[in-house]
Amino acid sequence: MTPTLLREVGEAIYGPRWQSELSRALAVSDRTMRRWLAGVNDVPDAVRAELRVLAQGRRKALDRVIARLR
């Protein structure tokens, strides 16, 4: 996973202040997140699966809200 994709997913799930929230959700430090984003360390493969679960959860929540707005 590239730092760019990590940033895109983080912003899509949590909005503009995504880094700290995503760090908490993944149980990693803010420093680890910054190192992934800077390309200092690779994003572990397991994080991709965790991000998929988080994104799917956000999508379900949004779908419920959208349904209520109809």
Task: Label each region the model flagged.
Residues V40-V53:
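Short, basic-rich loop-to-helix N-cap that marks the start of a DNA-contacting helix
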Residues P16-R34:
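Short alpha-helical DNA-recognition segment
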Residues R59-R70:
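Short, charged recognition helix plus adjacent turn
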Residues R17-E21, A46, R64:
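Alpha-helix N-cap and coil->helix boundary residues
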Residues M1-G15, G57, A61:
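A short, Lys/Arg-rich alpha-helix, primarily the initiator
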Residues G15-P16, N41:
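Alpha-helix boundary/capping and short turn/kink residues
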